[in-house]
């Protein structure tokens, strides 16, 4: 399901207190290239592993992202219909409620408390931000040889800089993985 504008607004309110990890497939147009980050940090340092995951939205396509988030101690999922989908095989809680309403309560709660971000959280945030920024720059500067990757990158760059806004559908696993690297919009699978 495409991420709503309201959901994005509340994610922005939480962005100074949480690391928002996502696949490009959901249309959250910020940093991208999560698989590149995970490839670079996986097995290198456990300090990247979150102690808490709040999952919103649909399924996660990236096997690497699923595997990484399985290591979190606590995993909660917001489920508007009450469905329990244990993407990470270690779910600890399901919040039965509307995604936007739940994010609003969390974001407003943080803002009302007006708490300073603890040093440990700020350090974790900085660690992730640097890693995501490096991956973002790598993807922008990456020039693949003539291949499927080159075709998808060229297509996505044309789309990104155009005024035209079609709904783009990727239909097989290879194209979806490539879209997850290069797309900065919602991708229909």
Model-inferred region functions:
Residues 3, 27-30, 146, 171-175:
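A general structural motif
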Residues 69-174:
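Phosphate/pyrophosphate-binding active-site segments
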Residues 2-76, 84, 185-189:
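Glycine-rich, anion-gripping cofactor-binding loops and their flanking helix/strand elements
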Residues 10-13, 150-155, 178:
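Amphipathic alpha-helical segments that form well-ordered structural scaffolds
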Residues 58-59, 111, 160, 184:
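Residue-level marker of positions within ordered structural domains that often coincide
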Residues 3-6, 63-64, 105, 154, ...:
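Phosphate- and divalent-cation-binding pockets in alpha/beta enzyme and binding domains
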Residues 170-189:
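Acidic-glycine-rich active-site phosphate/pyrophosphate-binding loop
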């Amino acid at each position: 399901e495409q991420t709503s504008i309201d959901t994005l607004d509340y994610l922005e309110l939480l962005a100074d207190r949480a690391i928002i990890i996502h696949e490009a497939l959901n249309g959250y147009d910020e940093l991208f290239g999560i698989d590149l980050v995970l490839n670079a940090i996986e097995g290198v340092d456990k300090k990247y592993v979150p102690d808490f995951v709040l999952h919103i939205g649909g399924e996660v396509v990236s096997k690497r992202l699923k595997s990484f988030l399985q290591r979190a101690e606590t995993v909660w999922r917001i489920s508007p219909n009450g469905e329990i989908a244990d993407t990470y095989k270690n779910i600890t809680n399901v919040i039965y409620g509307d995604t936007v309403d739940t994010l609003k309560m969390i974001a407003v709660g943080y803002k009302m408390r007006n708490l300073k971000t603890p040093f440990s959280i700020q350090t974790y945030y900085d660690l992730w931000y640097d890693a995501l920024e490096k991956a973002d720059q790598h993807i922008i500067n990456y020039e693949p040889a003539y291949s499927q990757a080159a075709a998808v990158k060229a297509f996505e760059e044309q789309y990104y800089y155009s005024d035209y806004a079609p709904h783009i559908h990727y239909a097989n696993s290879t194209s979806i993985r490539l879209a997850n690297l290069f797309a900065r919009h919602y991708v229909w699978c």
